[in-house]
């Protein structure tokens, strides 16, 4: 395992032909029937994200998996993780695209419940400003995921931790709304503290452990440290591939834009209005050009390298679990992020 600075090497490897091959491998990827059905229903809602996203997530899910999952559970785990991402995306769409906080709060109650609590809001009790159809679909996605997870061999051991970690994703989404509404309050430190959890990799780990062949409770602390590094690396890859699109949409919560704000490269008053009521493409393109001139993307790749080295150190300390495949998988995830720029 080479623990130097692979990010730049990965970035250089994603040339036009290689990027096209990676993208085609995603487009050719088949979703399992359960997931295909949920995605088809999701796409009936206005503003739904394209099929490519779900093919991308499902194809890459094994790269984010800890090597504790038995071969007979790998497909189930990949599907469960993709269903989780679909649920998170439903919530993301509500606050980032629709600014529908009432519906967001209604759906969030599903996650904030204890496992044995009753449904927090029957359909007939929705307030008038809550999108009941959207909540009903979100409930279907969430209960489908829980029903599948309950069949996992070690579900009971990790169920409460899973719910806790999913709640951190909700906090990450809520922090994003703070940044969008008040970009002058955004800091990279807060992004790393809160928003990075939007990647959901702690919850991914919980799912892996539910389907583990053995009991890895004794390695849980080290595994969560490893996931922390991997999640930051995944967040950087996501920022690199989406920040320009998000800026044009008025979402200024990416690490690149927040860094530009902190350094005074752009001012809060220059940012596009998140309500999408005006054509801001020209103004956004000017900001993008200015940010690109300062090469902030290279700085993020350097940060990625730092997390990679931390992950390598953790791998060397791990005796009970071979973290090598997870470490190597982070490079593939970065490669696919960079190849999919402009497609997600």
What is the predicted role of each segment?
Residues 121-156, 262-321:
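Primarily interfacial, aromatic-capped hydrophobic alpha-helices that serve as membrane anchors
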Residues 47-61, 128-240, 244-247, 324-344:
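All-alpha helical catalytic cores of prenyl diphosphate-utilizing isoprenoid enzymes
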Residues 6, 12-45, 104-180:
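N-terminal, motif-rich segments that launch catalysis or mediate targeting to/interaction with membranes
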Residues 76, 80, 195, 226, ...:
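Aromatic-acidic/polar surface patches that form glycan- and anion
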Residues 92-114, 205-299:
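Acidic, Mg2+-coordinating active-site segments of isoprenoid diphosphate-utilizing enzymes
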Residues 1-86, 90, 94-98:
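Conserved N-terminal diphosphate/IPP-binding helix and adjacent helical/loop segment
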Residues 80-83, 197-206, 306-310:
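Well-ordered alpha-helical segments within folded domains of soluble proteins
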Residues 80, 104-107, 301-344:
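Short hairpin/turn module used for nucleic-acid contact or packing/dimerization
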């Amino acid at each position: 395992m080479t623990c130097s600075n692979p990010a730049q090497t990965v970035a250089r490897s994603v040339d036009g032909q290689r990027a096209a091959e990676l993208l085609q491998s995603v487009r050719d990827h088949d979703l399992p029937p359960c997931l295909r059905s949920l995605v088809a229903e999701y796409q009936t809602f206005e503003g739904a994200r394209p099929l490519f996203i779900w093919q991308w997530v499902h194809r890459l899910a094994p790269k984010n998996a800890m090597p504790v999952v038995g071969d007979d559970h790998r497909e189930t785990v990949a599907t469960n993780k993709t269903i989780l991402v679909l649920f998170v995306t439903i919530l993301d769409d509500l606050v980032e695209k629709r600014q529908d906080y009432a519906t967001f709060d209604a759906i969030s109650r599903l996650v904030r419940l204890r496992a044995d609590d009753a449904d927090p809001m029957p359909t007939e009790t929705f307030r008038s400003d809550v999108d009941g159809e959207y909540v009903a679909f979100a409930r279907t996605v969430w209960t489908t995921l829980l029903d599948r997870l309950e069949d996992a061999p070690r579900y009971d051991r990790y169920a409460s931790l899973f719910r806790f970690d999913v709640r951190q994703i909700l906090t990450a989404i809520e922090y994003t709304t703070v940044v969008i509404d008040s970009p002058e309050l955004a800091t990279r430190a807060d992004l790393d503290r809160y928003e990075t959890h939007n990647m959901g990799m702690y919850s991914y780990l919980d799912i892996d452990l539910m389907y583990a062949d053995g009991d890895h409770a004794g390695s849980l602390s080290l595994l969560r440290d490893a996931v922390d590094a991997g999640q930051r690396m995944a967040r950087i890859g996501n920022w690199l591939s989406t920040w320009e699109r998000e800026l044009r949409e008025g979402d200024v919560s990416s690490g690149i834009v927040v860094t530009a704000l902190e350094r005074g490269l752009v001012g809060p008053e220059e940012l596009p209005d998140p309500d999408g009521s005006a054509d801001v493409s020209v103004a956004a393109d000017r900001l993008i050009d200015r940010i690109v001139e300062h090469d902030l993307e290279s700085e993020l790749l350097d940060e990625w390298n730092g997390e990679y080295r931390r992950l390598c150190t953790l791998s060397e300390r791990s005796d009970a679990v071979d973290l090598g495949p997870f470490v190597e998988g982070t490079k593939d995830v970065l490669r696919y992020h960079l190849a999919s720029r402009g497609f997600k």
